[in-house]
Amino acid sequence: MTFKGFDKDFNITDKVAVVTGAASGIGKAMAELFSEKGAYVVLLDIKEDVKDVAAQINPSRTLALQVDITKKENIEKVVAEIKKVYPKIDILANSAGVALLEKAEDLPEEYWDKTMELNLKGSFLMAQIIGREMIATGGGKIVNMASQASVIALDKHVAYCASKAAIVSMTQVLAMEWAPYNINVNAISPTVILTELGKKAWAGQVGEDMKKLIPAGRFGYPEEVAACALFLVSDAASLITGENLIIDGGYTIK
């Protein structure tokens, strides 16, 4: 591949991008940016208001589907619906997830199960089923949302840390297995991101204490994560696969 210039290499015009967790937070930011950069965007979320988000972004170039991605049959039905509208899927951005926090000795079993089911199983099933489509149609780009918790230990995050570390390992295996099919698979590991949930979880002194541990001195914004995702799903990142891009203001280098 030769460098074609920024306008072409970073261009995703008319690509079909599927984004999970698209009703809010990082997923919503990715859906908005992908659409702004010319992609057709399929927004998936278990919340019904994903349809309102799609309407706000671009009604003529988006498709919103309400789905629980922890069930294989649900994803298969969604992919069938997508194929009625678009000839192929070029991009998958896995952003759906949950954080249920408790000390390890007190963690309810259902917290563990729900975390693994959505964060890990849901992301795998999405990648598996859409990966098959990409193999059949000549390739694609997959971005899995991990976390700084994939590489460091965080208090009360035992289930979350385990699920996100597994996401990175899964990403590496998928990248290795699917490279011959022209499929790039990468992960993104953000620090605390100022989504609505992030703002609530890290409000007050706990947030101020956390920021003191970040060399950059601040938390991140959903748009910053979306920009990195855009790079990874563009031709500019065609030789990058199996990587875990850490977006944490230097937190994990300390």
Curated annotation (Swiss-Prot):
Entry superkingdom: Bacteria
Keywords, ordered alphabetically: Cytoplasm, Glycerol metabolism, Magnesium, Manganese, NAD, Oxidoreductase
EC number: 1.1.1.6
Secretion signal span: none
InterPro entries in UniProt: NAD(P)-bd_dom_sf (IPR036291), Sc_DH/Rdtase_CS (IPR020904), SDR_fam (IPR002347)
Positions with a binding annotation for NAD(+): 18-47, 164
Names of required cofactors: Mg(2+); Mn(2+)
One cellular-component annotation, GO: cytoplasm
UniProt xrefs under SUPFAM superfamilies: NAD(P)-binding Rossmann-fold domains
Residues annotated as catalytic: Y160
Family statement: Belongs to the short-chain dehydrogenases/reductases (SDR) family.
Entry function: Involved in the glycerol metabolism. Catalyzes the NAD-dependent oxidation of glycerol to dihydroxyacetone (glycerone). GolD specifically uses NAD.
Entry protein name: NAD-dependent glycerol dehydrogenase
